[in-house]
């Protein structure tokens, strides 16, 4: 039986199986839904009701009958869930799990950036804070970014941020000039062309697949570029039996689960910049997931005026990608 004063030292004595059992019971007690990103640890994905990329999770946050949303991801994801569900309790296993990409775009600096380009609309990656969303016209994810940009008239100038690599990929794919904010995801930006070529030589039968947050020098060698969900879908449908996967390796858990006969090779690290794991996503442990449900904390809150402003570009995204 769980109580609101369960302590971390007590939860740490529970086995994975015991934690999973208690989480199932708590879901019923709270009428909760657990959402987890593909980059979280396998046991958290195992506990989740829905595992997905940013777009799938945003849709799941909007379309559910739960009273409580437990979001295992990074802060902007749980914040987005709260923006979409002001009347629901939104919990997060670790509210210190931030996103350096989102943090690379401060509100005051982005506001000034927009003021430098008054005739441009701002399309911002969902990997951004509520304050940045509130300054934007449309939000997007890597799953729907190309589809959204394609709907903007060609004569309309576009500011895109905060991820410069995703913006560069979109510009080349769509032959569309955009004004780019110079942020990046440290995980994807760390992959280098030299080590990718070496991996392709070492595994000649493997297809290189990559997330568009990678640098252009890496993407040009990939046989397929897509969002986390698109990469997963590609590996299921492709006749290839082995893949070099240039994205955060948390996705390999789901890839191996869906295609148990195939081989998935994490893209190699550059020794000079070996940050190929999102440490913030990994802060969401099964123990923290359990404790946040027991204690109904940490709770995610958003100022109502900010929430209303940030909701508009998110709703616009969902409408344009329906």
UniProtKB/Swiss-Prot annotation:
The answer to whether the entry has keyword Transferase is yes
Q: Which domain of life is it from?
A: Bacteria
Q: Which SUPFAM superfamilies match?
A: NadA-like (SSF142754)
Give the reactions, separated by semicolons, that this protein catalyses.
Answer: iminosuccinate + dihydroxyacetone phosphate = quinolinate + phosphate + 2 H2O + H(+)
Name this polypeptide is given: Quinolinate synthase
Look up the record and name the cofactor or cofactors this protein needs. Answer: [4Fe-4S] cluster
Recorded GO cellular component terms are: cytosol
Binding residues annotated for [4Fe-4S] cluster, in chain numbering:
99, 185, 278
- Pathway membership: Cofactor biosynthesis; NAD(+) biosynthesis; quinolinate from iminoaspartate: step 1/1
The organism's lineage is: Bacteria, Pseudomonadati, Chlorobiota, Chlorobiia, Chlorobiales
* UniProt family annotation: Belongs to the quinolinate synthase family. Type 2 subfamily.
Q: What InterPro entries does the entry give?
A: NadA, NadA_sf, Quinolinate_synth_type2
Enzyme Commission number(s): 2.5.1.72
Q: What does this protein do?
A: Catalyzes the condensation of iminoaspartate with dihydroxyacetone phosphate to form quinolinate.
Q: Which GO terms describe its molecular function?
A: 4 iron, 4 sulfur cluster binding; metal ion binding; quinolinate synthetase A activity
GO BP, one annotated term: 'de novo' NAD biosynthetic process from L-aspartate
Q: Which UniProt keywords apply?
A: 4Fe-4S, Cytoplasm, Iron, Iron-sulfur, Metal-binding, Pyridine nucleotide biosynthesis, Transferase
Residues binding iminosuccinate, per UniProt: 37, 54, 125-127, 142, 211-213, 228
Q: Which gene encodes it?
A: nadA
Q: Does the keyword Metal-binding apply?
A: yes
Species of the source: Chlorobaculum parvum (strain DSM 263 / NCIMB 8327)
Cofactor binding description: Binds 1 [4Fe-4S] cluster per subunit.
- Chief subcellular location equals cytoplasm
Q: List the subcellular locations.
A: Cytoplasm
């Amino acid at each position: 039986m769980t109580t609101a004063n369960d302590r971390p030292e007590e939860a740490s004595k529970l086995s994975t199986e015991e934690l999973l059992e208690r989480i199932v019971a708590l879901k019923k007690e709270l009428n909760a839904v657990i959402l987890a990103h593909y980059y979280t640890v396998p046991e958290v994905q195992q506990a989740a009701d829905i595992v997905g990329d940013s777009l799938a999770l945003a849709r799941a946050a909007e379309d559910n009958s739960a009273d409580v949303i437990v979001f295992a991801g990074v802060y902007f994801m749980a914040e987005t869930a709260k923006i979409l569900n002001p009347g629901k309790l939104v919990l997060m296993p670790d509210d210190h799990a931030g996103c350096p990409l989102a943090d690379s775009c401060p509100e005051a600096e982005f506001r000034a950036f927009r003021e430098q380009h008054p005739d441009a609309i701002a399309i911002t990656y969902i990997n951004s804070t509520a304050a940045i969303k509130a300054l934007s016209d449309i939000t997007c994810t890597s799953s729907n970014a190309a589809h959204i940009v394609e709907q903007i008239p060609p004569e309309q100038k576009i500011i895109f941020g905060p991820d410069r690599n995703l913006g560069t990929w979109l510009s080349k794919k769509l032959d569309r000039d955009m004004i780019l904010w110079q942020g990046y995801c440290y995980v994807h930006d760390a992959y280098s062309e030299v080590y990718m070529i070496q991996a392709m030589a070492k595994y000649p039968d493997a297809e290189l697949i990559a997330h568009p947050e990678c640098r252009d020098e890496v993407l040009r060698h990939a046989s397929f570029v897509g969002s986390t969900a698109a990469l997963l879908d590609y590996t299921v449908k492709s006749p290839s039996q082995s893949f070099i996967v240039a994205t955060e390796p948390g996705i390999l858990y789901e890839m191996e689960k869906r295609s148990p006969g195939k081989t998935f090779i994490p893209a190699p690290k550059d020794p000079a910049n070996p940050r190929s794991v999102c440490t913030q996503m990994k802060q969401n442990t099964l123990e923290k997931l359990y404790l946040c449900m027991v204690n109904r904390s940490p709770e995610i809150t958003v100022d109502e005026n900010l929430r209303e402003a940030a909701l508009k570009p998110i709703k616009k995204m969902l409408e344009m990608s329906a």
